[in-house]
Amino acid sequence: MTFTNTFKRKVCRVIAALAAVACTMSLAACGADETGKIRIGIKFDQPGLGFKKSGTYVGFDVDVAKYIAKKLGYSEDQIIWKEAPSKQREAMLQNGDVDMILATYSITDERKKAVSFAGPYFVAGQDLLVRKDDNSINGPEDLNGKRLCSVTGSTSAATVKEKFASEVQLMEQPGYAECATALFSGIVDAVTTDDIILAGLASASRGKLKVVGKPFTQEHYGVGIKKGDTQLATKINNAIVDMIQDGSWENAISDNTKGTNYTPDVRYNPPTPDEGEEA
C-alpha cells in the first residue's frame, strides 16, 4: 500500500512537471487561450503608428490592423496584440508566434526569403524632423556641419551622409523618443527616419517639432505573414483596397498625424496592394 501511494505521488509529480513544461511551450493550451483569436504584431513604442498607451494600442498601423482583422471576421476583442521589435519580426512569423505583423515593416527582397508580405498599405519616404522655428534645414543637403540623430541599427543616417551631406555629424540613440529629446534640447539639429514615423513624433511634440516634408527615399510598408500564404495575402490586399476606397485609410492618416500638416507622398499613396498573391 505504501509503495502504491508513493508511486502514485511520483507519477503525479512527473505529470505536473510535464504540464508546466507544456505551458511554457504553448500558451494557447494553458490559460491564455488564443483559440478563435488573431495574433497581430505591432510596435509598442512608435507614436502615431504603433504605441501602447495605458493598456490600449493606438496608431496608423493599429488602425489598419483592426480594419484588416474585421474584414477577416475578427472583432477588436478577438485581437491579441504582440510587440514585434524589428530584429524579431521574421522569427515571430516563422515560429508561428503571430498571424501577421504590421510594424513599419518594409517589403524587401531579402526579407521575402524568410517571410511573405501582403500590401503595401503605405509608402513612406525618408525625411527629416527639425525644431519648429528652424528654417535652415529644408532637405538632406542642408545637413553639412549639422548634427543628425538616428536609431541604433538604422541605415537612414548613413544614407544621408553617403548621398547628400558628407560633413554631417551622426549621433545614434536607442529609440526615436531619445532622438526627439536630443532635438528638443539642442544636442542635435535633426532626426531622420521614415516620414510617417517623424509625423507621429511631431504630433506628440505639441507643435514644437516639424517634418521638413521633402522625402528622398521610398519604403513600402507591408503586412508580414507566413511564407507562401497566398490566400491570406489576397484577403488582406482586398481589405486594404476596401479601406482605401471607403475613406478609412485617409481618416487613419489624419487622426494619427494631427497638428503636423503631414501629407503622404501622393506619387505613391494610396498604394496598390498586390504583394504576395499567386501570379
Residue map of PLM features:
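Bilobed "Venus flytrap"/periplasmic-binding protein-like clamshell domains
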Residues: 44-47, 57-70, 127-180, 190, ...
